[in-house]
């Protein structure tokens, strides 16, 4: 009413306690939106300035974070001094749930299918694939390609059930009516790598191809069905993103 009095125009239609914009009101609304957006931007920037340290709650699958996150962190931290990350190491499925629950702002994740959903926004940032890894002295190390039948008796180390890797591998065995010999499930990639490095056991694990390094005792073998995956970041769709989250998303879009 104050605005209507000030401008001498009817801005709202009032009927049964419901307000709708008149043509004059719609015009004022359109004029005001850029000002409101700019105010929100100023407010966010001032909050960052006052807090000095910006914090981003980030979810990363343990194995993916081993090779993907360090170079991203190094460049972003240099460009954004005072920026802080709080990292949660969850599997891909748990990461998505944590974003939806508001526990984390952004998650890195992997998928073997096109991700479309009503609740999460996805940005593809790369590709990888799972390969079978064994110690170089393992009898299987000489193989160029391997099948589920070849490793049906091999003690397997898998990530935990909340990971896409676990779901993919157990499904592959199930399709061929083979029960995998799961020795251990762990989200600690350091443990998995140490077990593979040791020649005292004949265990194997499915790991990302980028984790096979020259000079190590671990050999990577292509699985008969190529296990290609897309690497993504995801965040809550239609949510009011903090400036810290927006800044990181823009960095990923422009640099990855």
What are these regions (language model features)?
Residues 4-21:
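A short LG(V/I)-centered, amphipathic sequence patch enriched
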Residues 6-7, 28-50:
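Alpha-helical linker/hinge and terminal dimerization helices associated
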Residues 30-31, 71-75, 92-130, 134, ...:
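Short beta-strand-centered segments that line the small-molecule binding cleft or hinge
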Residues 51, 55-80, 84-88, 93-96, ...:
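N-terminal winged-helix
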Residues 91-92, 98-103, 110, 164-219:
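Hydrophobic hinge/microswitch elements
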Residues 116-123, 128, 190-238:
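Beta-alpha-beta core module
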Residues 120-130, 134-156:
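Flexible hinge/capping segments at coil-to-helix
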Residues 155-176, 241-249:
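Secondary-structure junction motif
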């Amino acid at each position: 009413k104050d605005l209507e009095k000030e401008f001498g125009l009817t801005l709202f239609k009032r009927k049964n306690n419901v307000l709708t914009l008149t043509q004059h009101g719609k015009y004022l609304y359109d004029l005001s939106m850029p000002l409101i957006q700019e105010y929100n931007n100023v407010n966010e920037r001032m909050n960052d300035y006052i807090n000095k340290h910006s914090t981003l709650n980030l979810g990363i699958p343990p194995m993916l974070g081993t090779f993907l996150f360090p170079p991203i962190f190094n460049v972003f931290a240099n460009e954004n001094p005072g920026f802080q990350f709080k990292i949660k190491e969850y599997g891909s499925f748990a990461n998505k749930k944590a974003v939806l629950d508001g526990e984390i702002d952004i998650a890195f994740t992997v998928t073997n299918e096109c991700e479309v959903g009503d609740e999460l926004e996805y940005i593809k940032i790369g590709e990888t694939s799972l390969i079978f890894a064994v110690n170089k002295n393992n009898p299987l190390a000489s193989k160029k390609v391997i099948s589920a039948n070849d490793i049906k008796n091999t003690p397997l180390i898998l990530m935990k059930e909340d990971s896409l890797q676990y779901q993919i591998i157990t499904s592959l065995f199930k399709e061929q009516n083979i029960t995998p010999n799961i020795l251990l499930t762990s989200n600690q990639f350091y443990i998995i790598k140490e077990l593979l490095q040791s020649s005292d056991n004949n265990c194997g694990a499915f790991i990302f191809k980028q984790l096979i390094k020259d000079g190590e005792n671990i050999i990577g073998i292509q699985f008969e069905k190529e296990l290609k995956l897309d690497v993504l970041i995801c965040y809550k769709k239609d949510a009011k993103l903090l400036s810290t989250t927006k800044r990181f998303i823009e960095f990923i879009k422009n640099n990855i």
